[in-house]
Amino acid sequence: METIHKKSLSRSPRDMFFIAALLVTAVSVLFWSMPLMAASQKYFPSPEDALKGLVEAVKAKDKAALDQIFGPSGKELRSSDEVQAANEFEEFTKHVAEKTSLVKENDSRVIIHIGNENWPYPIPLVKKNGQWFFDTEAGKEEVLNRRIGEDELTAMLVCRTYVKAQREYILKDWDGDGILAYAQKLRSDPGKRNGLFWRHAQGEAASPLGELVAQARIEGYKKEKTVFKEQPVPFHGYYFKILTKQGEHTPGGKYDYIINGNMVGGFGLVAFPSNWGKSGVMTFIVNQRGKVYQKNLGPDTMKIAQEMQSYDPDETWTLVKE
């Protein structure tokens, strides 16, 4: 652990999104599996002692100690995606083990930097009445912004991956009905290949959505009860739903993608946050043309997206740049 020093760092946008994937964890992740106690927040005699307390609690996975370190405000920063949270915590622990340092902003505010890349921790250390504490309330907006940014980037990536998967799926009659068509489901029914993902034995053809699902399995979304359960499980804070129509604001006009039971006219997808304002803000849509559009649907995002059937980006939707 290094002592306090003054340092200025320049970071690219890519760096900042990488930070989001890792450093939000010690706040949002460490609380995901524990009830928040009513105990008052812990204060430390120095920034060095505060950093030492955080590092020891993280390494020991001591959630009770972390509860005291971050105080009651930590409850608002819990991640709704337990699998994502657990994996991010492991990643965070690894970077804490690499290196930690303290960067002095002024006599009463210090920022912790973590890992070999010196990523700034979003919760500042603040001095009050001669004691130091983690000002969770002050860092709350930054924590949520980082989480939302990372989740939204993942949702956009899934939209583009979905387009590639559908383009691959239609090249072969996977369901054996004699018709080349797009998949109407994200996951196949057990024992079938009527969706973009299916389980396959060694030597058999992998599903078009294999890479995405493989990544999900690596991150913990691998138990049968979560992969195949009827109740949807958010992936990095987002739900995904196939759209089977397009509206009047789309090239080609309004029509159904499904003809005589087969989706041959095109395909669409909507990606929307599972917890608007916390896991994401923007809703994303894409169709066979591969252009992703975004829009903030507001607090009623869940209801609006669940009722959405058509890909129809009017002037209120914004094109997402590649």
Identify the residue ranges that each predicted region occupies.
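N-terminal secretory signal peptides that target proteins for export/translocation
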Residues: 1-16
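Bacterial N-terminal signal peptides
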Residues: 19-32
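Short, low-complexity N-terminal intrinsically disordered segments enriched in polar/charged residues
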Residues: 36-60, 103, 139-164, 168
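Short, well-ordered alpha-helical segments enriched in acidic and aromatic residues
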Residues: 62-74, 181
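Surface-exposed, charged secondary-structure patches
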Residues: 71-121, 229, 233-234, 246-248, ...
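Short beta-strand edge/turn micro-motifs at domain boundaries
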Residues: 110-153, 157-160, 291-296
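Flexible, glycine-rich surface segments
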Residues: 169-278
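C-terminal soluble interaction/assembly domains
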Residues: 265-322
